Protein backbone atom coordinates (compact mmCIF):
# COMPACT_ATOMS: atom_id res chain seq x y z
CA UNK A 1 0.00 0.00 0.00
CA UNK A 2 1.38 3.41 -0.96
CA UNK A 3 -0.55 6.49 0.02
CA UNK A 4 -2.75 5.67 2.09
CA UNK A 5 -20.25 15.30 1.12
CA UNK A 6 -25.27 17.38 1.23
CA UNK A 7 -25.08 20.47 3.29
CA UNK A 8 -24.71 19.84 6.99
CA UNK A 9 -24.23 21.89 10.05
CA UNK A 10 -20.69 22.42 11.23
CA UNK A 11 -19.23 23.75 14.38
CA UNK A 12 -15.57 24.72 14.55
CA UNK A 13 -13.79 26.36 17.47
CA UNK A 14 -10.08 27.11 17.82
CA UNK A 15 -8.13 26.90 21.05
CA UNK A 16 -4.60 28.32 20.91
CA UNK A 17 -2.32 26.26 23.17
CA UNK A 18 1.05 27.99 22.98
CA UNK A 19 3.19 30.64 24.67
CA UNK A 20 1.96 34.28 24.62
CA UNK A 21 4.93 35.23 22.45
CA UNK A 22 3.90 32.86 19.65
CA UNK A 23 0.11 33.07 19.98
CA UNK A 24 -0.20 36.11 17.68
CA UNK A 25 1.30 34.15 14.77
CA UNK A 26 -1.82 32.00 14.37
CA UNK A 27 -5.10 33.19 12.82
CA UNK A 28 -8.19 33.77 14.93
CA UNK A 29 -10.46 30.81 14.25
CA UNK A 30 -12.12 31.13 17.63
CA UNK A 31 -15.85 30.86 18.08
CA UNK A 32 -18.39 28.57 16.49
CA UNK A 33 -18.75 27.90 12.78
CA UNK A 34 -21.63 26.48 10.75
CA UNK A 35 -21.68 25.34 7.14
CA UNK A 36 -23.42 27.74 4.76
CA UNK A 37 -22.30 26.87 1.21
CA UNK A 38 -21.00 23.63 -0.27
CA UNK A 39 -19.69 23.73 -3.84
CA UNK A 40 -18.48 20.59 -5.57
CA UNK A 41 -16.43 22.56 -8.07
CA UNK A 42 -16.23 26.35 -7.56
CA UNK A 43 -14.63 26.76 -10.99
CA UNK A 44 -17.88 25.73 -12.70
CA UNK A 45 -21.43 27.13 -12.64
CA UNK A 46 -24.10 25.43 -10.55
CA UNK A 47 -25.74 22.47 -12.31
CA UNK A 48 -24.45 19.71 -14.55
CA UNK A 49 -20.72 19.21 -14.40
CA UNK A 50 -20.58 19.58 -10.63
CA UNK A 51 -20.76 15.84 -10.00
CA UNK A 52 -17.68 13.76 -9.24
CA UNK A 53 -15.62 12.97 -12.39
CA UNK A 54 -15.81 9.22 -11.85
CA UNK A 55 -14.32 6.61 -14.15
CA UNK A 56 -16.18 3.45 -15.06
CA UNK A 57 -17.19 1.31 -13.19
CA UNK A 58 -17.13 3.75 -10.24
CA UNK A 59 -19.83 5.92 -11.79
CA UNK A 60 -22.11 2.87 -11.95
CA UNK A 61 -21.24 1.96 -8.36
CA UNK A 62 -22.25 5.46 -7.27
CA UNK A 63 -25.49 5.32 -9.25
CA UNK A 64 -26.34 1.95 -7.69
CA UNK A 65 -25.72 3.38 -4.22
CA UNK A 66 -28.06 6.31 -4.86
CA UNK A 67 -30.72 4.00 -6.33
CA UNK A 68 -30.57 1.77 -3.26
CA UNK A 69 -30.94 4.80 -0.99
CA UNK A 70 -33.90 6.03 -3.03
CA UNK A 71 -35.53 2.64 -2.41
CA UNK A 72 -34.99 2.99 1.35
CA UNK A 73 -31.64 1.23 1.71
CA UNK A 74 -28.25 2.45 2.86
CA UNK A 75 -26.36 2.12 -0.40
CA UNK A 76 -22.68 2.57 0.43
CA UNK A 77 -23.53 4.89 3.32
CA UNK A 78 -22.62 2.61 6.23
CA UNK A 79 -21.74 5.13 8.95
CA UNK A 80 -25.18 5.16 10.56
CA UNK A 81 -25.97 1.48 10.00
CA UNK A 82 -22.63 0.06 11.16
CA UNK A 83 -21.29 2.94 13.24
CA UNK A 84 -18.24 3.26 10.99
CA UNK A 85 -16.33 6.52 11.63
CA UNK A 86 -16.71 9.07 8.85
CA UNK A 87 -12.99 9.75 8.59
CA UNK A 88 -11.51 11.78 5.74
CA UNK A 89 -12.68 13.64 3.79
CA UNK A 90 -16.16 13.27 5.18
CA UNK A 91 -15.13 14.42 8.66
CA UNK A 92 -14.29 17.84 7.22
CA UNK A 93 -17.72 18.14 5.63
CA UNK A 94 -18.62 18.25 9.28
CA UNK A 95 -22.18 17.28 9.83
CA UNK A 96 -21.19 17.35 13.50
CA UNK A 97 -19.32 19.77 15.73
CA UNK A 98 -15.57 20.12 15.29
CA UNK A 99 -12.95 21.99 17.24
CA UNK A 100 -9.48 23.02 16.10
CA UNK A 101 -6.69 22.95 18.68
CA UNK A 102 -3.40 24.55 17.59
CA UNK A 103 0.02 23.67 18.97
CA UNK A 104 3.39 24.52 17.38
CA UNK A 105 3.83 20.91 16.20
CA UNK A 106 0.31 19.57 15.66
CA UNK A 107 -3.15 20.83 14.81
CA UNK A 108 -5.86 18.62 16.30
CA UNK A 109 -9.32 18.40 14.79
CA UNK A 110 -11.72 17.12 17.43
CA UNK A 111 -15.11 15.97 16.22
CA UNK A 112 -18.21 15.17 18.23
CA UNK A 113 -19.11 12.63 15.51
CA UNK A 114 -18.93 9.11 16.95
CA UNK A 115 -18.26 10.88 20.29
CA UNK A 116 -14.46 10.90 19.95
CA UNK A 117 -13.04 11.17 16.43
CA UNK A 118 -9.69 12.95 16.44
CA UNK A 119 -7.66 14.00 13.43
CA UNK A 120 -4.00 14.94 13.83
CA UNK A 121 -2.33 17.30 11.36
CA UNK A 122 1.43 17.36 11.91
CA UNK A 123 2.96 20.80 11.33
CA UNK A 124 6.47 20.07 12.64
CA UNK A 125 8.10 19.75 9.21
CA UNK A 126 8.29 15.96 9.23
CA UNK A 127 8.67 13.84 6.09
CA UNK A 128 6.23 11.15 5.05
CA UNK A 129 6.79 7.84 6.85
CA UNK A 130 8.01 4.89 4.80
CA UNK A 131 5.10 2.87 6.17
CA UNK A 132 1.94 3.88 7.99
CA UNK A 133 -1.12 1.87 8.95
CA UNK A 134 -4.20 3.11 7.12
CA UNK A 135 -6.55 5.15 9.32
CA UNK A 136 -10.11 6.42 8.97
CA UNK A 137 -8.77 9.97 9.31
CA UNK A 138 -5.66 9.19 7.29
CA UNK A 139 -2.19 10.57 8.02
CA UNK A 140 -2.00 14.36 7.58
CA UNK A 141 0.98 16.68 7.24
CA UNK A 142 0.29 20.41 7.22
CA UNK A 143 2.07 23.73 6.86
CA UNK A 144 1.10 27.20 8.04
CA UNK A 145 1.67 29.97 5.47
CA UNK A 146 1.96 33.74 5.89
CA UNK A 147 0.75 34.80 2.45
CA UNK A 148 0.66 38.57 2.95
CA UNK A 149 3.91 38.84 4.92
CA UNK A 150 2.37 40.54 7.96
CA UNK A 151 3.90 38.09 10.42
CA UNK A 152 0.66 36.18 10.99
CA UNK A 153 -0.30 32.89 9.41
CA UNK A 154 -3.15 33.13 6.88
CA UNK A 155 -3.48 29.64 5.38
CA UNK A 156 -3.20 26.08 6.64
CA UNK A 157 -2.25 23.73 3.79
CA UNK A 158 -2.72 20.02 4.46
CA UNK A 159 -2.01 16.82 2.58
CA UNK A 160 -3.60 13.56 3.73
CA UNK A 161 -2.64 10.03 2.69
CA UNK A 162 -3.02 6.50 4.12
CA UNK A 163 -6.82 6.48 4.34
CA UNK A 164 -8.60 3.22 4.98
CA UNK A 165 -10.54 1.57 2.19
CA UNK A 166 -13.24 0.84 1.22
CA UNK A 167 -14.12 4.54 1.55
CA UNK A 168 -16.79 6.89 0.25
CA UNK A 169 -16.64 10.62 -0.33
CA UNK A 170 -20.05 11.55 1.04
CA UNK A 171 -23.36 10.04 2.14
CA UNK A 172 -24.50 9.52 -1.46
CA UNK A 173 -21.80 6.85 -1.79
CA UNK A 174 -19.23 8.40 -4.14
CA UNK A 175 -16.58 5.65 -4.05
CA UNK A 176 -12.83 5.89 -3.71
CA UNK A 177 -10.55 3.50 -5.59
CA UNK A 178 -9.85 0.33 -3.64
CA UNK A 179 -6.06 0.66 -4.04
CA UNK A 180 -5.87 3.05 -1.06
CA UNK A 181 -3.62 5.53 -2.87
CA UNK A 182 -5.95 8.53 -2.60
CA UNK A 183 -4.43 11.90 -1.68
CA UNK A 184 -6.47 14.83 -0.34
CA UNK A 185 -5.05 18.36 -0.36
CA UNK A 186 -6.72 21.14 1.65
CA UNK A 187 -6.42 24.90 2.00
CA UNK A 188 -8.13 26.46 5.01
CA UNK A 189 -8.25 30.24 5.32
CA UNK A 190 -10.43 33.11 6.48
CA UNK A 191 -12.24 35.20 3.90
CA UNK A 192 -10.35 38.45 3.31
CA UNK A 193 -13.54 40.51 3.07
CA UNK A 194 -15.31 38.89 6.01
CA UNK A 195 -13.30 37.39 8.91
CA UNK A 196 -16.41 35.51 10.01
CA UNK A 197 -16.22 33.28 6.92
CA UNK A 198 -13.86 30.28 6.80
CA UNK A 199 -13.05 28.50 3.53
CA UNK A 200 -11.95 24.88 3.15
CA UNK A 201 -10.89 23.95 -0.38
CA UNK A 202 -10.33 20.20 -0.82
CA UNK A 203 -8.75 18.59 -3.87
CA UNK A 204 -8.97 14.81 -4.15
CA UNK A 205 -6.52 12.84 -6.29
CA UNK A 206 -7.71 9.25 -6.66
CA UNK A 207 -7.59 6.52 -9.28
CA UNK A 208 -11.39 6.30 -9.34
CA UNK A 209 -11.46 9.86 -10.76
CA UNK A 210 -10.66 11.05 -14.26
CA UNK A 211 -8.91 14.14 -12.86
CA UNK A 212 -8.20 15.88 -9.54
CA UNK A 213 -11.53 16.98 -8.04
CA UNK A 214 -11.94 20.29 -6.19
CA UNK A 215 -14.74 20.95 -3.72
CA UNK A 216 -15.18 23.89 -1.36
CA UNK A 217 -16.84 24.11 2.01
CA UNK A 218 -17.67 27.51 3.48
CA UNK A 219 -18.37 28.08 7.18
CA UNK A 220 -19.76 31.09 9.09
CA UNK A 221 -18.59 32.12 12.55
CA UNK A 222 -21.05 32.30 15.44
CA UNK A 223 -20.17 33.94 18.76
CA UNK A 224 -20.77 31.01 21.14
CA UNK A 225 -19.50 27.44 21.09
CA UNK A 226 -22.12 24.74 21.69
CA UNK A 227 -20.69 21.25 22.13
CA UNK A 228 -22.84 18.12 22.31
CA UNK A 229 -22.17 14.39 22.15
CA UNK A 230 -23.09 12.14 19.26
CA UNK A 231 -23.34 8.40 19.89
CA UNK A 232 -24.01 6.15 16.92
CA UNK A 233 -24.93 3.08 18.97
CA UNK A 234 -27.51 4.64 21.26
CA UNK A 235 -31.06 4.43 19.87
CA UNK A 236 -29.75 2.93 16.61
CA UNK A 237 -32.58 0.74 15.32
CA UNK A 238 -30.71 -0.46 12.20
CA UNK A 239 -29.68 -4.12 12.15
CA UNK A 240 -27.14 -5.32 9.57
CA UNK A 241 -27.34 -8.97 8.48
CA UNK A 242 -24.91 -9.94 5.76
CA UNK A 243 -25.05 -7.25 3.08
CA UNK A 244 -28.57 -6.15 3.97
CA UNK A 245 -29.77 -3.79 6.66
CA UNK A 246 -33.16 -3.87 8.37
CA UNK A 247 -34.99 -1.90 11.02
CA UNK A 248 -35.82 -3.22 14.46
CA UNK A 249 -39.38 -2.42 15.51
CA UNK A 250 -39.49 -0.54 18.80
CA UNK A 251 -43.01 -1.83 19.41
CA UNK A 252 -42.53 -5.59 19.25
CA UNK A 253 -38.78 -6.03 18.64
CA UNK A 254 -39.26 -7.71 15.26
CA UNK A 255 -37.21 -7.04 12.16
CA UNK A 256 -38.80 -4.87 9.50
CA UNK A 257 -37.74 -4.27 5.88
CA UNK A 258 -36.10 -0.97 5.01
CA UNK A 259 -37.02 -0.94 1.35
CA UNK A 260 -39.76 -2.20 -0.90
CA UNK A 261 -39.48 -5.85 -1.90
CA UNK A 262 -36.63 -6.56 0.53
CA UNK A 263 -36.32 -10.27 1.27
CA UNK A 264 -36.27 -11.36 4.93
CA UNK A 265 -33.02 -12.70 6.41
CA UNK A 266 -32.50 -16.35 7.25
CA UNK A 267 -33.78 -16.67 10.83
CA UNK A 268 -33.94 -20.44 11.06
CA UNK A 269 -31.89 -20.42 14.26
CA UNK A 270 -34.33 -18.03 15.96
CA UNK A 271 -37.97 -18.20 16.97
CA UNK A 272 -39.05 -15.26 14.81
CA UNK A 273 -41.44 -16.41 12.11
CA UNK A 274 -40.73 -15.71 8.45
CA UNK A 275 -43.47 -14.89 5.99
Describe the residue ranges of each PLM region.
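Bacterial N-terminal signal peptides
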Residues: 8-19
Amino acid sequence: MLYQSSIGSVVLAAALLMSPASAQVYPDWSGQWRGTVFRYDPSKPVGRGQEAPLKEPYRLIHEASMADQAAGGQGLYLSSARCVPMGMPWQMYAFFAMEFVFTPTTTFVLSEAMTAQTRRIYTDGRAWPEYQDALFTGYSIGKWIDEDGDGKYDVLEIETRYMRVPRIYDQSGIPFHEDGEAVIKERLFLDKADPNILHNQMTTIDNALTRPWLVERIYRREPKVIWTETNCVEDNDIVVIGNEDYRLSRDDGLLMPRKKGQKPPDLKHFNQAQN
